[in-house]
Amino acid sequence: GCFGITILMLAVYYIIHVLFITESYIETFTASAQNTAVYSTSICNNDCIEPGASITGANKVEYDPVILANKKSLVVNRLTDRAKDLINVIKMTFYYTDTQTLFNKENDLVLEDILYNFDIYKLKQALNPGDSINLFFTVKNKPNTMIRNNSSVVSNGTFFNNSAFPSFGYSGRELTDDKTREKYDLPPNKLKPFPSDSTALGNTYISKDADWIDFEATVSTSKDQIAIAPGYLQKEWIEGDRRYFNYKMDSKILNFYAFNSGKYEVAKDKWNDVNLEIYYHKDHDYNLDRMMKGMKAALDYCSTNFSPYQHKQLRIIEFPRTAGGFAQSFPNTVPFSEDIGFIAKVDDSEEGGNDYSFFVTVHEVAHQWWAHQVIGADVLGSTMLSESLSEYVSLKVIEQVNGKKKMRKFLKRSLDEYLTSRTFERKRENALMYNDGQGYIHYQKGSLIFYALSDYIGEKTLNNALSKYVKKVAFQEPPYTTSIDMVNHVKEVTPDSLNYLIKDMFETITLYQNRVVETKSKKLDNGKYQVDIEFKVSKYRNNEKGRIFYGEEERDSITYQTDDMKKPEYSVFLEDYIDVGIFGEDNDEKEIELYLKKLKISSIHNKISIIVDQEPIEVGIDPYNKLIDTNSEDNRMKIEK
């Protein structure tokens, strides 16, 4: 197995050929990019060939200096008139300390930050528009030890991505905590730029040093292993004790890719004309059927509702939990930790937890649309376009499989995790469409918001708006799309009566305090039951620091107070449609819906009576937890007999 393996004296060597060619019109950011990346990579442990013997390649980097000077941030002097004319400074960031670089043009190393692996080179002769410069580089990592994990290269199950290679430009890895910054006389860090920042719109939030690239990789590994990279296998051969694989992508991809190597078994299937494969450790076959089912379900949902799938294959590749408990979606390739799917013991009973081997698979496949077709600019809110919408797809697919009535535990889990995580926020919490990239916002809150929105305006209506949005921005060149673009597409299909949802869900931080106060029922002469419900609904907003307010102006809020109340209760002005539900039991004592309808609520305090055909057991206000309610435990109440 892959548990607790300790590997001594491991190293990885990369021989990389890279060609980037960019043409653009910088003033309007209507750039068209043609970038080619060809990689030759060796994955070795201590029985690898001699390091010198594996260094056989060169790296060529050709940029249009106009793009680099402005859009790619490779020039220290940011004066616009000068930046358009030449490049005289190159910035480079390294992941591994032992990274050796060599340019083919004379330069001086003017800054070497050995703590954060950031160098600045000044060219002795500046690059004019149309000039090119070659870069040769070799990357090594330190060997793993008994107490320190330095390398992602292991004896079985290697996984690393392109962050291991040098990157160009300013990385933006700055101190984020304002109190820490204050100690160094630094101003508060604003993190991501606003969507109005024209420079930031020239980059995706995934990569600042390239746009869409043509990708080809040759990877060597141990003779008994399979090496995998994005693209389609073109050639495989053995040379000495090394096994080689050549992959090539047939369409442009983001500058975002990974390499895997392991002693894999391979499970195969098909979805329409798409080849499906799962590369797994021999003893970890517990949930292959669930993961294969998840791939098919996600491909079905996304291709039906948004746009066609852009590749002819889709692969999941297992890696050891020592690299982390996550999955990551690259073009047609999804590295997937053993820890979150392959070795899970799934409880399919009513009381069981979520089938996360299926759920995570759907989420990662959804990224083939929401990240690899639609990619946001490097601005606030862009992770809503990738993570929130992928989570939304997961919830809708689970709803198709399990039915709407079983969605409460999924929604409540997301709600509770969001509410808990936001209490630990140290910097600021923005509204969803302007989030800073915090996981609890774009995962937990985002999934709730989009699921609720599909419930309010209709799943088909929402998906049609998203499909229209995909058609507009998929695979686009700079300037890249933003959350504002997507929200505008949703606004177009939202009825006037529900316009408040746009403000509550996307533009502000809005929370509810809904609760059932009292309920009782009585049997009528005709055999039906009258259910009386007293309940309260209120909502408020938070600013980025968590301060509560009830409206932009005094008249925007409403109050409720009785004679025996010391203080009134407040709410933002209400014209809200909220689910009211009444529930009974079937012959097996399982919950069934007797009544579920959205009622328009305009007051904090409410009393209603509803007639149902069967004996009621429980009532609920927003009973399925679709809204962001600060205490969902009081949304339901057993009926007083």
What are these regions (language model features)?
Residues 86-87, 92-160, 203-204, 599-615, ...:
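A surface-exposed beta-strand-loop module
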Residues 59, 189-362, 392:
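Hydrophobic helix-coil surface modules that form long, contiguous segments used
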Residues 310, 439-530:
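Amphipathic alpha-helical substructures
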Residues 387-448, 452, 456, 474-478:
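Acidic/His/Gly-enriched intrinsically disordered linker/tail segments
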Residues 29, 38-46, 64, 71, ...:
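Extended, low-hydrophobicity, Ser/Thr/Pro/Gly-biased non-transmembrane segments
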Residues 88, 98-103, 229, 499, ...:
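Beta-strand-rich binding/interaction modules
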Residues 8-76, 80-83, 498-504:
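N-terminal, polar/Ser/Thr-rich
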Residues 296, 301, 347-409, 466:
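Zinc-dependent metallopeptidase catalytic helix centered on the HExxH motif
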